[in-house]
């Protein structure tokens, strides 16, 4: 019998999307699953909908808890999970029928510690593009170092917690930082560092739903600096543990700083704006001279020598359009 996979779904006020998410998980071709719906203090009826699913399907368990945020909900799910493997799906996303099967087969055949699939981004209010769903045909086997290199250079391997299947052992002693945004970043590093190898599949089995109210689409506020802090810590950890990837870590850090910097639109955050610009100036030379760096990062580094105003003007006009 296939081993038990625990699928952890944090739920907070996502009632309009929850049926789509849960139905896609209960319809998996891989049958030996437990679905942990972690109700993080919902008030829109999501909590009752979770209970309805638990009453209808023995594979569903519901954890009701006080609101503590995404990290706290994920941690509660990890603590309660009974499976040998863990997977995470956000409550407004959904997956293909072969999502877990493809991830598990790749992991098993590769002898990997975790596997990752690609995703299809879906924007609120826009039609969903049809993506063929199929069983696994091929996958890549990545060493720990190559996996980390791709994360840092953003070459198809994401830091996001969803889209992956993990051996439970990777989470022994690892939990998400409570009260912080962009909590995926530090955990992605810790589990990758513990893994001997990973399997990466090209199937786009995960549908990542972008709502207008999502963190990524929110206007700048100082809490978004959590992303910069996480990426700085990531860079320092990589330089300590994998010095051969130092340039890659600097590239990731500069990309992150630019992403947050150019979200700032008003004068009340001028001090933050100036501090982030100093970070760009500090790392731009190394990124510019790194032939493996993303084109976006090298473009930002090169433009920065023309001054902040020009760099920002080009960014706002193009969003580095067409560059990778």
What does each model-found stretch correspond to?
Residues 253-258:
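TPR repeat positional signature
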Residues 55, 70, 160, 248, ...:
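General helical secondary-structure elements
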Residues 171, 238-239, 303:
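Hydrophobic alpha-helix position signal
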Residues 112, 266-324:
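Membrane-interface aromatic/basic loop that binds lipid-linked glycans or pyrophosphate carriers
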Residues 1-227:
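Nucleotide-sugar donor-binding/catalytic module of glycosyltransferases
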Residues 244-252:
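All-alpha amphipathic helical-bundle segments outside canonical DNA-binding/catalytic cores
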């Amino acid at each position: 019998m296939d081993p038990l996979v625990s699928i952890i779904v944090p739920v907070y006020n996502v009632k309009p999307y929850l049926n789509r998410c849960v139905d896609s998980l209960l319809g998996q071709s891989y049958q030996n699953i437990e679905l942990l719906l972690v109700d993080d203090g919902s008030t829109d009826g999501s909590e009752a909908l979770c209970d309805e699913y638990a009453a209808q399907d023995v594979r569903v368990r519901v954890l009701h808890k006080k609101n503590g945020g995404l990290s706290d909900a994920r941690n509660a799910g990890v603590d309660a999970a009974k499976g040998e493997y863990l997977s995470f799906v956000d409550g407004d996303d959904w997956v293909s029928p072969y999502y877990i099967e493809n991830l598990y087969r790749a992991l098993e055949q590769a002898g990997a510690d975790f596997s990752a699939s690609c995703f299809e981004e879906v924007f609120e209010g826009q039609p969903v593009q049809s993506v063929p769903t199929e069983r696994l045909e091929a996958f890549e086997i990545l060493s720990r170092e190559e996996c980390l290199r791709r994360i840092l250079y953003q070459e198809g391997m994401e830091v996001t917690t969803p889209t992956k299947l993990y051996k439970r052992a990777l989470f022994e002693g690892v939990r998400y930082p409570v009260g912080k945004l962009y909590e995926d970043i530090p955990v992605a590093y810790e589990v990758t560092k513990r893994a001997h190898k990973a399997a990466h599949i090209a199937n786009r089995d995960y549908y990542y739903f972008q709502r207008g109210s999502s963190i990524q689409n929110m206007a700048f506020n100082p809490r978004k600096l959590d992303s910069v802090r996480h990426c700085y810590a990531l860079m320092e950890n990589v330089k300590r543990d994998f010095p051969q990837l130092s340039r890659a870590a600097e590239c990731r850090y500069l990309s992150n700083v630019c992403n947050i910097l150019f979200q700032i639109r008003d004068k009340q955050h001028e001090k933050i704006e100036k501090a982030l610009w100093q970070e760009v100036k500090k790392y731009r030379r190394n990124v510019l001279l790194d032939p493996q760096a993303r084109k976006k990062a090298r473009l930002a580094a090169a433009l920065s020598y023309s001054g902040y105003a020009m760099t920002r003007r080009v960014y706002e006009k193009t969003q580095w359009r067409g560059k990778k």
